[in-house]
Swiss-Prot record:
The keyword Nucleotidyltransferase does not apply. It comes from Xanthomonas axonopodis pv. citri (strain 306). Its EC number is 1.3.3.11. This is Pyrroloquinoline-quinone synthase. GO terms for molecular function: pyrroloquinoline-quinone synthase activity. The lineage of its organism: Bacteria, Pseudomonadati, Pseudomonadota, Gammaproteobacteria, Lysobacterales. Ring cyclization and eight-electron oxidation of 3a-(2-amino-2-carboxyethyl)-4,5-dioxo-4,5,6,7,8,9-hexahydroquinoline-7,9-dicarboxylic-acid to PQQ.
């Protein structure tokens, strides 16, 4: 029979899941961070990743709507402000669009979602469905991938600035902000999970939630790798750098 874990052991188990399954282990990220992708492949990554960025505040709004405690809502709503900002030129979504602009992508194309890979769209929609349908505890636990974000962000920024002459530190401003936002958010979520996962069943659910979220991030990179690295099978309506040259800003 499985025993109830203490808070510290539960945290250790959650961190072990991330160490094994977080998307920093995916081959596509190794290629991105070590300068092995060309400009078109980096564009494809940024364009598809925008779908995930766009849906982060939708995910957080869905979680917020299920919180009955005003104090909890006040804390969680900061996540929405972080991404939506206080104006169209502020926040994480605006900063990601600044990155896609800097990479030479047409903003209308990026925002429209017309050129997404199906795998990207399905993975993101699966995540939204998860936080809407599962328990509040599971939804919060699914955000714990942020525990592992600072490490991958550091690798990404350093690697991209070193290897890609078409990327600037200004273009990567999104990641600078996440270096402070992600630890703040994950510290709160981890404390919440450790406090509220107070049965064997709940502890199994929060571990499964983190496992699921890791699979969402991994699936997005699988789609990118299959389409733009090997074997190079691109959905006919998805972004193709050479074919879509007329849809990319000069």
């Amino acid at each position: 029979m499985t025993a109830l874990l203490g808070p510290d052991q539960l945290e250790a188990d959650l961190r072990a899941i991330g160490a094994r399954l977080y998307h920093d282990q995916h081959p596509f990220h190794a290629l991105l961070h070590h300068g092995k992708l060309d400009r078109g492949q980096v564009q494809a990554w940024a364009l598809n990743r925008f779908e995930y960025q766009r849906c982060i505040p939708l995910k957080d709004a869905a979680i917020l709507a299920r919180m009955e405690d005003p104090a909890l809502r006040r804390i969680w709503r900061q996540r929405i402000l972080d991404h939506d900002g206080n104006s169209a030129s502020d926040g994480g979504i605006a900063r990601w669009l600044h990155l896609t602009d800097a990479l030479g992508l047409d903003r209308t194309l990026v925002e429209s979602g017309r050129a997404l890979l199906p795998g990207t769209r399905f993975a993101v929609q699966a995540y939204l469905h998860f936080v809407r349908e599962k328990s509040l505890l599971e939804a919060i636990a699914s955000s714990l991938t942020e525990l592992f974000a600072p490490n991958i962000i550091g690798q990404r920024v350093a690697g991209m600035l070193k290897h890609y002459d078409f990327v600037s530190s200004e273009a990567l401003a999104y990641f600078e902000h996440r270096l402070t936002e992600a630890p703040r958010d994950s510290d709160f979520a981890l404390d919440y999970v450790k406090q509220h996962a107070d049965t064997v069943e709940k502890q199994a659910l929060v571990k499964a939630a983190l496992h699921f979220k890791c699979s969402v991030l991994w699936a997005q990179l699988d789609a990118l790798h299959v389409a733009y690295v090997a074997p190079g099978i691109v959905w006919p309506d998805a972004f193709v750098p050479d074919r879509d040259a007329s849809r990319v800003a000069a």
